[in-house]
């Protein structure tokens, strides 16, 4: 998330990336916005106050809208190669502003059989009830599901619920991580 770097630039006293993630995931303002309980203006005002950011709401929202940078160019091919053999679901801590970009700019929701954006579901990772909600909605047991995420906190939470979980820090590490589990995914230029 580009926003982590930006938040640390705005306010270096926020600490390390892990410390900022812990604060972000536990933030009342983030939780309210990314579970659909508040609007973007109230969110911006609350984040600025909570994190002591030296910017106004307009500046924050202008940058926040672009924190998701892009979709990796091989993501569609990799997910398509998996979708023919596995049921794919996205669990995303997100908000209406970012989800609109995911759909409009990258058609991301179409790459999954099921989507569980937090602002629509009303739940957030790393909370156990988010994982449990998704498992119930899909009708599968935790030990029959694999969860991958770039955030260690979310991976540990998924494991605590009983899911198989892997931390994958960047897209290029995804196919090798899946291959270690016997799941072979194709990307352009790779043999399947």
Write out the residue ranges for each language-model feature:
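Active-site neighborhood of HAD-like aspartate-dependent phosphohydrolases
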Residues: 1-26, 50-54, 160
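Short alpha-helical
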Residues: 2-6, 28, 70, 97, ...
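Alpha-helical elements of Rossmann-like donor-binding domains used by nucleotide-donor carbohydrate transfer enzymes
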Residues: 5-9, 28, 42, 46, ...
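Structured helix-beta-strand junction loops
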Residues: 27, 84-85, 111
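A metal-dependent, Asp-based hydrolase signature
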Residues: 30-60
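Short, acidic loop-to-helix structural element flanking the phosphoryl-transfer center
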Residues: 58-89, 100, 128
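Asp-based, Mg2+/Mn2+-dependent phosphohydrolase catalytic module
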Residues: 95-96, 100-192
